[in-house]
């Protein structure tokens, strides 16, 4: 939990905030004590790649700092396309109950991962690209979007993706306008807004979807097909979604940053994409707002954390919760909140966890045989 000091206008501390903080800490004590004792690490088959070097706005390149005014204080909300797409992808994985862990350029151990998602990582080093190639060559699945790997960290570029051989597509040097659509047989048309996306041609990848653009420039005041929107018009034939086999693995390339949009149609597209290419989803009857995290301690203990994370407090309790977790035969299960044992129920190589009621949070310690 994170609290900022609560100070009244007269300079005194707001005692009710600290009373609330104390109640939260006391309620979390069984869980924090278990984590301190076990010191587990995230258990996941999916990796989400975050490129700090790519968190830039190329449109501001060359603008003197004295002229750069974002119009916001240090407490304001800023927009960063890459961070927005990574966080939206993380939300989608959480909604789908797909455990994941964050990867960066400093993460050398990719063991245990079956799929890695790279969101619009424009600036990648040769070492990062080599690690991604090796991952796919050895049987992994890479999902890359947008401008990923177009330039090295110093900005140098050949004009094509560094990972063009892995993607199976080539960058044409051209971009869409700020509105474009992905056209696929399954989803029809899915919009990407407020971003110019690269136009690419298939080299030797399988074409899963193409790029459709409006008939006229976005938001043109004189030429338009609709006065209040930019509807799809021309199917360009450029590759929008592709699948490329590489070594023993495969690479999915998505031309746009539509995963950053948190609207229903874009989320539905992302869910279909991840269900097809990202393994490790847990079966449960939990709503999208609930989170499930898997952790593994050094002694082999599996820790399952379930959080009822509704947007508007207080949480509405969830009843008759069921979760299925693929795992080896289990010796015992203990509920962390009260330390009581839980009956072990296995079915088809999966552990079945049941909760009669989930208010806010619960954890389980699972000892495997």
Residue ranges and their predicted role:
Residues 1-369:
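Carbohydrate-binding surfaces of carbohydrate-active enzymes
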């Amino acid at each position: 939990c994170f609290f900022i000091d609560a100070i009244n206008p007269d300079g005194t501390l707001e005692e009710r905030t600290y009373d609330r903080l104390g109640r939260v800490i006391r309620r979390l004590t069984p869980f924090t004590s278990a984590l301190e004792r076990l010191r587990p690490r995230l258990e996941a088959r999916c990796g989400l790649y975050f490129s700090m070097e790519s968190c830039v706005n190329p449109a501001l390149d060359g603008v003197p700092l004295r002229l750069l005014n974002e119009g916001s204080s240090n407490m304001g909300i800023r927009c960063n396309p890459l961070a927005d797409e990574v966080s939206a992808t993380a939300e989608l994985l959480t909604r789908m109950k797909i455990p994941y862990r964050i990867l960066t350029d400093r993460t050398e151990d990719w063991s245990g991962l079956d799929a890695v998602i790279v969101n619009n990582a424009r600036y990648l080093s040769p070492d990062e690209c080599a690690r991604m190639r090796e991952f796919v060559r050895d049987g992994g699945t890479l999902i890359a979007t947008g401008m990923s790997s177009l330039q090295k960290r110093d900005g140098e570029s050949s004009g094509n993706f560094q990972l063009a051989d892995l993607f199976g597509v080539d960058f044409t040097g051209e971009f869409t306008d700020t509105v474009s659509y992905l056209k696929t047989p399954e989803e029809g048309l899915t919009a990407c807004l407020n971003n110019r996306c690269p136009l690419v041609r298939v080299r030797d990848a399988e074409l899963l979807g193409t790029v459709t653009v409006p008939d006229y420039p976005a938001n043109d005041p004189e030429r338009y097909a609709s006065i209040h929107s930019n509807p799809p018009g021309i199917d360009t034939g450029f590759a929008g979604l592709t699948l490329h086999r590489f070594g023993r693995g495969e690479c999915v390339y998505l031309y746009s940053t539509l995963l950053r949009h948190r609207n229903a149609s874009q989320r539905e597209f992302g869910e279909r994409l991840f269900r097809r290419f990202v393994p490790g989803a847990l079966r449960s009857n939990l709503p999208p707002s609930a989170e499930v995290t898997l952790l593994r301690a050094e002694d082999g203990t599996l820790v399952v954390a379930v959080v009822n994370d509704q947007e508007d407090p207080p949480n509405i309790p969830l009843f008759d919760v069921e979760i299925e977790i693929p795992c080896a035969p289990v010796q015992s299960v203990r509920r962390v909140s009260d330390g009581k044992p839980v009956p072990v129920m296995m079915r088809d190589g999966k552990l079945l966890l049941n909760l009669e009621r989930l208010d806010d949070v619960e954890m389980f310690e699972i000892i495997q045989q």
